């Protein structure tokens, strides 16, 4: 098997290096019969594209996959139909890095879902800078109920340093509009981006409390090889490839105190603070407006309803 890096007792072994297959449509549908998927969460995943048009400095996607590349619409909907008919799937999440980067393609996917009268609940990871109200309204019509926007900070200064290409007023408007459509919304925030100050955390707290997402994923930054932020800091920081680190990279009492204040404020606003994966079981049938915040990966498919 080419393109593998394997750690063995003798050391690190690298198999034949072959060029990445850029034409997504040459790849077969995943064979889910190779493992017992009934042992996993009931929300199934589908990847319909690779890459992203963004250039966020902390993200590997544009540097690993290169330009954005989407699968054929019919192929995508065939896989959706297979998940439903063969595996009795009720919920599917588009696990693309940015499912809505190509508006026309997503419209065509929705049209095909509608044409086949497919009944399923969907979720999608979306870049907030690619937000399109008309598109999300159509997606909602065919069964999409959940979206994830990576916002990362409430500081205009840090947004520019991250190269997010958005501003605070835009963020607030997008979240407000998306809520009105009816979506359950997850947002993510990085709390220890390099040069973060007490004031930056305060601004992040203010933004979170103003937009009140249903799900809040709180991160400490993972420095990933190949990203600009890694290259800028590789000689001075401890690096981790693990995105779910539970320790901040910046040792600063002011930052720590503000993060603790943020947690207390969230609890006052009736956010359920989740500390480990076991806790997800109690939210399986929770109300669709249940608010959750976590430093651990949040389970997909919770609180999705018609």
Model-derived features: where do they sit?
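Glycine-rich beta-alpha loop elements in corrinoid/cobalamin-binding modules
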Residues: 1-18, 220, 226
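A structural micro-motif
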Residues: 2, 10-11, 120, 183, ...
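Short, internal active-site loops enriched in acidic
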Residues: 11, 98-100, 129-130, 282-289
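Radical SAM [4Fe-4S] cluster-binding motif and immediate context
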Residues: 25, 29-186, 193, 206
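Flexible glycine/acidic-rich beta-alpha junction loops that bind and position SAM and/or redox cofactors
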Residues: 54, 157, 161-162, 191-199, ...
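C-terminal structural cap/anchor segments
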Residues: 178, 200-201
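Catalytic-core region of carbohydrate-active enzymes that cleave or remodel glycosidic bonds
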Residues: 209
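Radical SAM enzyme core and accessory elements
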Residues: 228-234, 240-306
